[in-house]
Amino acid sequence: MPLVNGRFVADMKSPRTPDNEEPAAERACDFRPVDKGFTEEMALAEAERCLNCKKPFCVEGCPVNINIPRFIEQIREKDFGGALDTIREDSMLPAICGRVCPQENQCEGKCIRGKKSEPVAIGQLERFLGDRPELASTPVSYTHLTLPT
């Protein structure tokens, strides 16, 4: 990725990484999830597409204000544990939000890349990390929670 004015800049021509879906013939025979989520290689390729904007509108589009540029940069650096920790600073549900959050109207809807081409697949990157809790440098503790009586 080229360095311009002290910032890494992505190639605008790189296409969005397609979803990792079960082939139709296979999914017709079972009840496994259709979308298998990104592999590590797919996540790294998609993270390279981030423009590292000076004013990250994607964060403004996120209802919980996740530091999206930082976690994508950490994915790019293969610091998956750090990326998951970054998300968990604001959201403890990356695996769920990566699947059900309406990213097309929120973070991805605000992505600058989406003005000229397809936005970065922020939801898929979040899901990639959320599906791998063992990568976190700090394990999640729920001991502080109390059940209602």
State what each model feature region is.
Residues 1-141:
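Ferredoxin-type iron-sulfur electron-transfer modules and their immediate structural context
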Residues 143-149:
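Conserved small/polar residues in nucleotide/adenosyl-binding loops
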